[in-house]
Amino acid sequence: MFAPSYDAVLSYTSIGGVQCPRLCYKLVLVTVGLCFCIFCTSLDNTIVATAVPRITQQFHSLDDVGWYASAYLLTTCAVTLPFGRLYTFFPIKWVYLSALFVFELGSFICGITPSSLGLILGRAVAGLGGGGLFSGSLLIITQCVPLRRRPAFSGFIMSIFAVASVIAPLMGGAFTDHISWRWCFYINLPFGLVSAVVIFFTFQTTKPVVQASLREKAAGLDPLGTATFLPAIVCLLLATQWGGAQYPWGDGRIIALFTLFGVLLACFVGLQLWARERATLPPRLLRGRNIWGSALYGFCLNGAMFTFVYYLPIWFQAVQGTSATESGIRNLPLVISNVIFAIISGVLVSATGYFGPFMLLSAAMASIAAGLLSMLHPSSGAGEWIGYQVLLGSSIGMGFQLPVFVVQTTLASTDIPTATALMTFIQLLGGAIFVSVAQNVFRNQLAADIRAALPMLDPKAVINAGPTSLRAMYSGETLTTLVAMYNDAVVHTFYLAIGLAAASFLAATVIQWRPSPKSISHPDSS
């Protein structure tokens, strides 16, 4: 490892025990390395969607389809919050690189596996590593960037998450059609290698955020809380993934999963109240209205975002007859506006020190955009779906990263790792839960419409055929009717997004309108 001196050309600041230049090539390299890492971990959220038909054909594993996506999601959500404690008691650099190694190992297993079971296990392993990388990337920024500049850097990095989530199905389809579905996972290896090399050589940290003995660290990792939290989240996500899709909501398995979730969650809450400062989530963190308001805001806004990420491509493919690749291209207005406004939002928050007004504006714009998108119909022109997506992307880009900004500017440095992991977890959980809810809304509405207007068709067969097969299987008046039904079903998922965006607006009203005291009291970081 090398540590060149910047004294001759730059002034630098010490943040968290790390000597970091205000703006230099090493900071640029660290940011690029983090972007590579966030990009590949975010791809894994949705890239497998367009590869599933080819995978099931090769492995003859139609019954395993649900696990290809949920295995990664389950482990990612389950370990995100515990990673906050690891980042608190151990050097950020080594925890981050360890998580990256586990993620890369899982991706490698997915790429070389000869069986469906191997793919599921590989996805689960990748999720174990991925759960620590998003919050870890944001923590590295807090270590390297003066407070007033953090929102701009963090905003850019977090915009990569949204971009990757949107374009992942497009990349997955391209790899599957032109190379091999295995490249959906191999692509992570070079990205991860670049990120690991950059972080290893350019990011230097000396001490953990909290100094403690080995015994104190073991207690601070909250093994009892973790032992109840992990299975609780797994039960919740399995119930929302399976309910209404693989099993009826009244099925004994779904009821049992929700019951277990409730019992385990109650145990976790009790353990957190008992452990206090040694808890995975110290109760005092949730007493401030900025913290719980930001958590609710992120939960709802992310749920709305992922509803559109999943169902706008379905609208393009089923209603407007585009291919999977073309639908990805038509999502570019959402992607581009998201990136631009994430950067603009970060710069404005950095300049003013305020985040409350931007959270309100973001939620208001998202509510309007969701309402406009719910007005789409089979004859909607390009001007409508482009303009509505630009408004949606602008609103999401403006607000997506703000919950993290809140905790990083209002809490003590010792609480930032845990609070950052909390916000990351809440946002991931919101996306996971409401995509499942939207799936049930979509399937139930489409099935009801088919039974009412086309009783000669099997709703399950139509749904399982997928949007891209619609025009190959049906024609004439039947096709016209099915297209209208698909439009109606997708629009109903957008109604869900309207409610979520409105809820995020209510949550934003809780946030205090005052500049961060720390941002004002650090004139050297302006």
From Swiss-Prot:
Q: Which InterPro entries match?
A: MFS, MFS_dom, MFS_trans_sf, Sugar_transporter_CS
Q: Does the keyword Cell membrane apply?
A: yes
Question: What are the subcellular locations of this protein?
Answer: Cell membrane
Main localisation: membrane
Q: Could you cite one Gene Ontology molecular function of this protein?
A: transmembrane transporter activity
Provide the membrane topology annotation. Multi-pass membrane protein
Sorted keywords for this record are: Cell membrane, Membrane, Transmembrane, Transmembrane helix, Transport
Kindly name one Pfam family recorded for this protein: MFS_1
Q: Name one GO cellular component term.
A: plasma membrane
Against SUPFAM superfamilies, the record matches this protein to: MFS general substrate transporter
Transmembrane residues, as ranges? 23-43, 64-84, 89-109, 125-145, 155-175, 183-203, 218-238, 254-274, 296-316, 339-359, 360-380, 386-406, 418-438, 491-511
Q: What does this protein do?
A: Efflux pump; part of the gene cluster that mediates the biosynthesis of aurasperone B, a dimeric gamma-naphthopyrone.
Per the record, the similarity remark reads: Belongs to the major facilitator superfamily. TCR/Tet family.
Q: What is this protein called?
A: Efflux pump aunC
Q: What organism is recorded for this protein? A: Aspergillus niger (strain ATCC 1015 / CBS 113.46 / FGSC A1144 / LSHB Ac4 / NCTC 3858a / NRRL 328 / USDA 3528.7)
Name of the coding gene: aunc
